[in-house]
Amino acid sequence: MSTSFACTTCTVAFNNAESQKIHWKSDWHHYNLKRKVASLPPLSAEVFAGKILSIQKQNEEVQKKAEFYQNCEVCNKKFYSEGAYSSHMASKKHRDNLSKFQRNSRIKKLQSEDASSIASSTLSMGEPVVDSEIEEEEDLASQLTSRAISLSNLSLHGRESEPSKTELATSIPQSNEASKSHLFTQEPTPEEIEAELARRSSQRLSPRDCLFCAASFSSFDTCKKHMKASHSLYIPEREYLVDEPSLFDYLAEKISIGFTCLTCNREFKSLEAVRAHMQQKGHTSIAYDTEDEQLELSDFYDFTTSYPDYAVKQDETVVEEDGSSGEGDWEDVSDDSDNSSLDSLEMGRVPIADEYELHLPSGNRVGHRSLSRYFRQNLHSSSTAVGDGASIHQNVARRAMSGNARAYRQAVETSIAGVRDGRKNYSASHIKSFQDQRRREEFANKMGIKNNTKKHFRDALLQ
């Protein structure tokens, strides 16, 4: 073979010039030229073809991923990425929705089978069913369907609960006669409600059981210390609490029977569920912020000691008790004694002149806090309160201190007398910058206090 037609870049020879020209236009030759520029050895035709096939395969995979589309009928979602679709299929939410979807499908299948069996039933004599009897059977089928749906939504206080297979099996009668004699209603019966209450009452927590976990203790005080140390339980208005055991009994009943969270009042399906919620969310405190929440616990508190007239009423009670000891202890007092002396009880009372001023027995007057901006004003004394001689003396002194004399006195008081003007200006600017820095720090502290978004702060030492 003649070697006059060869490609030194790819190290191949050709029979004629046409083959050589076609080779020079090929991708293989162009690729080897780039490798030659990069000081790399050339590739053979087989290796280059393998690289082309691998690149085409990768492009097909990328195109396949770009055209990916899947629809989840259970969750009613669309996915355009294989990773997102696989993650969704493995998620707990999808599994829960799938179980609900399958359960609803079984219920619908049972309902359709029962309705079809009742509609196609015939009399025992083999005669066709009359139109009126067909309508009666259809009404019965609809009632059975509503009963199955009501069992799926049966709850004590509006909470949803899932029916078991045995309940669905027993709710559908086996014979036509039993179906006619046993008609159901959509609302739960009082017997079912009492049974549910009895079941929950059997799980009621005792005073020695922790409200937030499964721990149990030998005494109520030990249990209370555990809840305070381990779960940060805080009892609001402890100084006014008069019936602490009853309060904890009510909280235990709210958690173990009502399955309700103490903080957010959210209802759950079981005791374990509400405990897990309170531990995960940190809802281990008693809700006592709104007026309704305070009224809910008002039976366990007594706030009479916080009333302003509580001390006066206590004194009156003591006086009445002392006076009712016996009729022989009474003495006649003349009318003059009433005018000459005041009752000690009346002197202890503080008369209120109006709603903005309080007159104390000592003669002082206390103003209302809403008028504090006026009480803090430092007003100059009026000239009428000073005699004529004093006013003349003040005018003479004011004239004497006017102008340069006043400036010199101010300089002496600020210890800058005899200092050059440049030094004075520097001192004044330094004082001004210090005042500006102080204002900035005060503003920063004020904004920090104002923007503190922590809603609740209760010191454990103040309980």
Curated annotation (Swiss-Prot):
Domain of life the protein comes from: Eukaryota
Zinc finger (C2H2-type): 5-30, 70-94, 208-231, 259-283
Residue numbers spanned by region Disordered: 109-136, 155-189, 317-341, 444-463
Compositional bias annotation for Acidic residues: 317-338
InterPro entries on file: Matrin/U1-like-C_Znf_C2H2 (IPR003604), ZN622/Rei1/Reh1_Znf-C2H2 (IPR041661), Znf622/Rei1/Reh1 (IPR040025), Znf_C2H2_sf (IPR036236), Znf_C2H2_type (IPR013087)
Residues modified as Phosphoserine: S150, S155
Pfam families reported in the protein's UniProt record: zf-C2H2_2 (PF12756), zf-met (PF12874)
Family the entry assigns: Belongs to the REI1 family.
UniProt cross-references to PANTHER family, sorted A to Z: CYTOPLASMIC 60S SUBUNIT BIOGENESIS FACTOR ZNF622 (PTHR13182:SF8), ZINC FINGER PROTEIN 622 (PTHR13182)
Subunit structure: Associates with nascent pre-60S particles that have not yet entered the translating pool, and is released from mature 60S subunits.
Name of the protein this chain belongs to: Cytoplasmic 60S subunit biogenesis factor SPCC550.15c
Organism per entry: Schizosaccharomyces pombe (strain 972 / ATCC 24843)
Higher taxonomy: Eukaryota, Fungi, Dikarya, Ascomycota, Taphrinomycotina
